């Protein structure tokens, strides 16, 4: 990490786990297995060492936000309106954002009594493939211009104001937005927004996505490790698609494995690596917390903004 991280405090895993009293994780091994991405690795020990202290830190931020809102209400001589606590989770493709987000959803719903927690991925704000084809940018899918950022900002604004919102659903199996299908996002105590682009600036740079976040997390790892995880995930998707002709990955099951590996590597190099280096990683220092993962997926270092 370079000088851009001078305003972060680096904390070892050993020190981090000591910042929260030891308690039993509020979920079972089976529940943890069911929420992790199928090529990710996480244990109940990780929950105890990393995520319970993180949930406690979020609790501190939430309490601070509520105190500030109350004080503002007194200053403005009006009752403060309840708003959801919005958490942004970013990082590269295949780094483990989804596992982190789903785990936080469970922990927050069980740490805060009767709390409602909604989880949204920004994949739903990708333009449909047909739109990308018409604009000549299908090969730029995942890059900033392939997202309907205006719709994402509008969603965040409505959620921030306690409204229920219906948003599009994206399927990784068909590699496209699912027509006529919507995710109904209800007004909640917490809303977790996960995606590679959640710290990026929209083309209208007068309004920043991060302005809507009360807390933000970047899941980080070495580039070589992420590439290995991506290629592993790609090949595992083939095994799931063998008997599903509707899957985007089905066509690859008909190809020699060498050609498939070469294709996946080319996609990583030309799209995912380029996107990471040019658009995703440069936003890393906008997070409140950076979780750094080692080669075996274990979080070994935590960076907390000073």
Swiss-Prot record:
Query: What's any GO biological process attached to this entry?
Result: coenzyme A biosynthetic process
Q: Which SUPFAM superfamilies match?
A: P-loop containing nucleoside triphosphate hydrolases (SSF52540)
GO CC term, one of those recorded: cytoplasm
Name the domain of life.
Answer: Bacteria
The pathway that the record names for this protein is:
Cofactor biosynthesis; coenzyme A biosynthesis; CoA from (R)-pantothenate: step 1/5
| Keywords carried by this UniProt record | ATP-binding, Coenzyme A biosynthesis, Cytoplasm, Kinase, Nucleotide-binding, Transferase
> What Enzyme Commission number(s) appear in the record?
2.7.1.33
Q: Which residues bind ATP?
A: 91-98
Reactions catalysed according to its record: (R)-pantothenate + ATP = (R)-4'-phosphopantothenate + ADP + H(+)
Q: List where in the cell it is found.
A: Cytoplasm
Q: Which GO terms describe its molecular function?
A: ATP binding; pantothenate kinase activity
PANTHER family, sorted: URIDINE KINASE
Q: Which family does it belong to?
A: Belongs to the prokaryotic pantothenate kinase family.
Would you tell me the protein name for this molecule? Pantothenate kinase
């Amino acid at each position: 990490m370079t000088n851009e991280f001078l305003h972060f405090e680096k904390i070892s895993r050993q020190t981090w786990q000591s910042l929260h009293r030891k308690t039993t994780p509020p979920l079972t091994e089976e529940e943890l297995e069911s929420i992790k991405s199928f090529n990710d690795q996480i244990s109940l020990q990780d929950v105890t060492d990393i995520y319970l202290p993180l949930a406690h830190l979020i609790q501190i931020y939430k309490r601070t936000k509520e105190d500030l809102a109350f004080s503002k209400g007194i200053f403005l001589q009006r009752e403060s309106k309840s708003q959801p606590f919005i958490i942004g989770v970013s990082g590269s493709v295949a780094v483990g954002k989804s596992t982190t987000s789903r785990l936080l959803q469970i922990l927050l719903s069980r740490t805060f009594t009767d709390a409602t927690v909604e989880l949204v991925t920004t994949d739903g704000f990708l333009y449909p493939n047909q739109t990308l084809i018409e604009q000549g940018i299908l090969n730029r899918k995942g890059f900033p211009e392939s997202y309907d950022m205006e719709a994402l900002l509008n969603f965040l604004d409505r959620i921030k104001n306690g409204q229920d919102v219906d948003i599009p659903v994206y399927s990784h199996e068909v590699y496209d937005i699912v027509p006529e299908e919507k995710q109904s996002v209800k007004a909640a105590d917490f809303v977790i927004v996960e995606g590679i682009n959640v710290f990026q600036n929209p083309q209208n740079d007068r309004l920043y996505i991060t302005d809507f976040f009360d807390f933000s997390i970047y899941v980080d790892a070495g580039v070589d490790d992420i590439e290995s995880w991506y290629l592993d995930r790609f090949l595992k998707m083939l095994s799931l698609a063998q008997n599903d002709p509707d899957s985007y990955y089905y066509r690859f099951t008909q190809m020699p494995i060498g050609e498939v590996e070469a294709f996946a590597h080319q996609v990583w190099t030309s799209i995912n690596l380029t996107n990471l280096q040019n658009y995703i990683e440069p936003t890393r220092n906008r997070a409140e917390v950076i979780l750094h993962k080692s080669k075996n997926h274990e979080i070994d270092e935590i960076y907390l903004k000073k």
